[in-house]
Amino acid sequence: AYRKVHHPPIAEMKDFGIFLAGELERFIDETHLDRSRMLGVGIALPAVIAPDNSRITLAPTLHLRDITLQFLAKEIPYPTYIENDATSGGYAEWFLYWHRDMAYLLLETGVGGAVLVGDGQYHGVNRRSGEFGHMCVEPGGLPCKCGKRGCLEAYCSAWRISDDLGIPLSEFFAGVERHVPEYETMWHDLLRHLAIGVNNIRMVLD
């Protein structure tokens, strides 16, 4: 079952947690899921999460920094685990392909990733491994929401298209198919930097 809802701005984590718990219960009721069979709830966020799972260290696309997570799952009456969105997507692919070692690259509003080897994710010292979106693919290049310049995310994310052109993705790709010069130029620039990023990942991980 699947449901998409619009959420209020994440200004207060406590209020957002109450909203999230309410939407979850509504979803369970509408889809007639058996609560007694629920193993738990997963919350995926486009954010760097502290090693102890206590706070968001940085979430550029959400405009959040150093925000506590203690209230996010407080109203949810099921075991709840909070994880980075790209890591969650990486695990889904990892299970699908029978636990093969892999690097997962996610292109959405931002750019993320995960490295999964052996029995699970390689976290790194600060639980930041797989942040492929913030590897440099153009020294001194476009500014990124993380504060650096030349990041893969600055070139290959949906927000670049929406910020630079002021249009949604659907309109952008329709324009590429119609050979609109401005859109084609950005598309080829995006592909060039994506190729650099993918090649970097390949060379590092073999």
Give, region by region, the residue ranges found by the protein language model.
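Gly/Thr-rich phosphate-binding beta-strand-loop-beta motif of the actin/hexokinase/Hsp70
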Residues: 1-2, 104-118, 158
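Glycine-rich phosphate-binding loop and adjoining helix at the ATP-binding site
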Residues: 4-25, 29-42, 47-103
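Glycine-rich phosphate-binding loop plus the immediately following alpha-helix
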Residues: 8-11, 75-76, 82-86, 137-170
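Adenine-nucleotide phosphate-binding core of ATP-dependent small-molecule kinases
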Residues: 11-34, 152-155, 160-206
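A short, polar/charged loop-to-alpha-helix boundary motif
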Residues: 11-16, 128-140
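Active-site flanking residues adjacent to catalytic metal/cofactor-binding acidic residues
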Residues: 84, 107, 125
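Short beta-strand-to-turn element immediately C-terminal to the catalytic PLP-Schiff-base lysine
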Residues: 93, 114-118, 122-124, 137-138
